């Protein structure tokens, strides 16, 4: 006796409707699906991707942990935003499990405030890390579209409401955060210092900097100091 079986294809839509951010099983399933898809469908020129971008749905990289620089065991967390930002990206790429582990390695390469020390540390973990100081907003979006968070350096001091520009001051010059997403109005970031006040400058350290939103107009003024292709960022890939 013959038994006929009918193979019914799965519809992908229900799976993504009930996606749980951070669920390891779902992330593994998506990775498996990605590996089985033709390369031509995984380019930023693919028709489905262009439709996705114009739909108004924001782009976000999942799986980036949040580290507060003020939790540093060194006692100097107030000046270690660069370490914490780099550690978040390194942890996303699964080469470290804590910011203190990252910091121990970084000390071999230089001071926390030095770009070359951070780039060298990331490279020592086997990552491809590149510092650029001619970054455009589009470059940030391209990196997020590719599924990679990136570190951005920006001027967090200066009160726009008083007509002041973004500035450096006696306490330091610049701050590093990790951008993990964007939509038409904001960039989504992990800020190791806490919640930034994009209009008045500075941070509220009593509030978490996890998944904060930075309005595009305010971020542009603090990131693109010398023109539309003048931003500082570190791009990291495996």
Regions found by a protein language model. Name each.
Residues 22, 54, 108, 170-171, ...:
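Noncatalytic regulatory segments and standalone regulatory/sensor domains
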Residues 82-90, 99, 115-119, 137, ...:
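Extracytoplasmic/secreted envelope proteins and their assembly/folding machinery
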Residues 82-83, 111-115, 133, 172, ...:
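A structural signal for well-ordered alpha-helical scaffolds and beta->alpha junctions
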Residues 88-96, 121-128, 143-147:
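Structured segments of extracytoplasmic/periplasmic soluble domains
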Residues 133-194:
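Active-site-adjacent substructure of cysteine-protease-like catalytic cores
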């Amino acid at each position: 006796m013959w038994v006929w079986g009918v193979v019914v294809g799965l519809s992908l839509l229900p799976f993504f409707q009930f996606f749980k951010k951070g669920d390891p099983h779902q992330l593994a399933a998506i990775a498996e699906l990605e590996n089985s898809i033709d390369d031509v469908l995984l380019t930023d020129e693919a028709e489905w991707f262009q439709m996705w971008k114009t739909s108004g749905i924001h782009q976000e990289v999942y799986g980036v942990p949040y580290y507060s620089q003020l939790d540093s065991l060194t006692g100097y967390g107030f000046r270690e935003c660069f370490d914490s930002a780099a550690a978040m990206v390194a942890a996303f790429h699964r080469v470290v499990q804590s910011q203190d582990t990252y910091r121990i390695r970084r000390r071999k390469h230089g001071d926390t405030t030095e770009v070359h020390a951070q780039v060298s540390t990331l490279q020592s973990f086997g990552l491809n890390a590149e510092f650029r100081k001619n970054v455009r907003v589009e470059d940030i979006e391209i990196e997020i579209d590719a599924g990679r968070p990136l570190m951005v350096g920006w001027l967090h001091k200066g009160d726009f409401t008083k007509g002041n520009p973004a500035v450096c001051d006696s306490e330091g010059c610049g701050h590093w955060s990790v951008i993990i997403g964007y939509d038409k109005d904001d960039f989504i970031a992990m800020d190791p210092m806490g919640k930034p006040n994009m209009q008045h400058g500075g941070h509220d350290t009593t509030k978490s900097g996890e998944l904060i939103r930075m309005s595009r107009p305010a971020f542009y003024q603090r990131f693109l100091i010398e023109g539309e292709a003048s931003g500082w960022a570190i791009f990291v890939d495996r």
